[in-house]
Amino acid sequence: EDDLTHYYVATYVTDWGEESQPSDPVQMETVLPTWSARLRVNYYDVSLSAYGITKMRIYRSVTSTEQAEFLYIGEVEINPDTSFTHFGDSSYNLGGTTLSTENYDRPAKGLKGLTQMANGVVAGYFGRTVCFSEPYIPYAFPIEYQINTEDNVVGLASMGTNLVVCTQGTPYLFQGTTSSTMTNARIPVQQ
């Protein structure tokens, strides 16, 4: 039998089902496919309950000749003694759900001016940077959805799926159906 080396990540889950960005990958010991592995989850923090975080989802690496990804293997309640048993067999207990929150970055420190757009996107800013959330996921602000302006931003106004960005210099109009398709153009008027 071939030895297997697996990597694991965990995400926090709130009582509303909101799922966080994953932890850094942790390498599990190399095991034979028929062995079981007991994972000790040491992310417990008393303050988690203040944010409604009640569970952790565990994902395991699965590789093929074309790609590597993390697949869901289970969910555990958060408490000081959380542990999780998983078997080494690559086909055992894989729910098939691929980790989808890898780019769910926290809102940037100092983010302000939060504005809801009609497409479910929340926009905000800090300094010269305009930030956009994942649609309908207002706690996930992927870094790749940040767009810089030439001058410091002073305010935002939503108009449907458009966003007017007021700066200390020239205003901008941001347009896009989703956060990943946002483009901007200067409005040729001094503020």
Where do the model's predicted regions map?
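Beta-sheet-dominated scaffold domains
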Residues: 121, 149-191
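Surface-exposed loop/turn elements that mediate protein-protein interactions on large endomembrane-trafficking
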Residues: 128-146, 172-184
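Generic N-terminal initiation segments characterized by hydrophobic and/or small/turn-forming residues
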Residues: 36, 128, 186-189
